[in-house]
Amino acid sequence: VHWTAEEKQLITGLWGKVNVADCGAEALARLLIVYPWTQRFFASFGNLSSPTAILGNPMVRAHGKKVLTSFGDAVKNLDNIKNTFAQLSELHCDKLHVDPENFRLLGDILIIVLAAHFPKEFTPECQAAWQKLVRVVAHALARKYH
């Protein structure tokens, strides 16, 4: 994947403002609410029976932070995303059996969360760079499936 200097700047510039705990929790909660079938991968998280329960669930919050923290590894390693996510791809494919389509869904949700949190900064150019990034990350996570 080739990144232009502008794309790198748009991604890293916005990432520097992201509250990983809050945005991660919101992104995962939205995924579980908007696409309820994804809840089956989180059966150990306890009560996911309603949007209120999901939004207040500390395990959702903690895992959302973990997910977005690892997404930060992509931001730090834009030129080596495939290798950055090799182990996570293996885990999600071989052990957790997550449908790789869910990575794309979470990426789309992350775009919505970023747009909501940063309405001024999230210009169409910024969105284009981030869409490219979430697509590359989703592809890297799905790599073990191919």
UniProtKB/Swiss-Prot annotation:
Alphabetical list of Pfam families matching this protein: Globin (PF00042)
Any one cellular-component term (Gene Ontology): haptoglobin-hemoglobin complex
Keyword Iron found: yes
Ligand binding (heme b): 63, 92
Alphabetic keyword roster: Heme, Iron, Metal-binding, Oxygen transport, Transport
Signal sequence interval, chain numbering: none
All residue ranges annotated as the Globin domain in the record: 2-146
Top-level taxon of the source organism: Eukaryota
Gene Ontology biological process terms in this record: hydrogen peroxide catabolic process
Expression across tissues: Red blood cells.
InterPro entries in the cross-refs: Globin (IPR000971), Globin-like_sf (IPR009050), Globin/Proto (IPR012292), Hemoglobin_b (IPR002337), Hemoglobin_oxygen_transport (IPR050056)
One of the record's GO molecular function terms: peroxidase activity
Family indicated by similarity: Belongs to the globin family.
Entry function: Involved in oxygen transport from the lung to the various peripheral tissues.
Self-association and partners: Heterotetramer of two alpha chains and two beta chains.
Name assigned to this protein: Hemoglobin subunit beta
Gene label: HBB
